[in-house]
Amino acid sequence: MIRSFVLASIIAVIAAIAHAEEPIVGNWKTAAGDTAVIASCGGSYCVTLKTGKYAGRKIGTLAGTGGSYAGEITDPAAEKTYSGAGKVSGNSLRMQGCVMKVLCKSQTWTRL
């Protein structure tokens, strides 16, 4: 009986770990007020606008773990792609886009 309980507990913990999502996954309110969804896509995370003028457009791909991510971010209005990064802290996501890693612009998104 005890062995069955221990085995069931171990299986539950392993299942929870396997299904744990990275902190970046979810819906975020952008600085412009649009909703962006960040979801797993292959070995990275895709950033797609869910609402607003550019709804449905993929605007980024980031890779990383544990709250720090790097990749590419696209400004849909200018149709330009930049080196990007994201850092999750609680319900905030600090997104940054850089040109040649010298000229950078950042904004904070809020988890919905």
Annotate each language-model stretch with its function:
Residues 9-11, 67, 77, 81, ...:
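Long, low-complexity, intrinsically disordered polar/charged segments
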Residues 4-14:
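Sec-dependent N-terminal signal peptides
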Residues 18, 36, 45, 93, ...:
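A broad, low-specificity signal marking well-ordered, structured residues that form hydrophobic/aromatic
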Residues 111-112:
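Short, solvent-exposed mixed-charge patches
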Residues 85-108:
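Short, exposed beta-strand-loop hairpins at the edges of beta-sheets
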Residues 22-85:
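Central antiparallel beta-sheet cores of small beta-barrel/beta-sandwich binding domains
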Residues 14-21:
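Sec/Tat signal peptide C-region and signal peptidase I cleavage site
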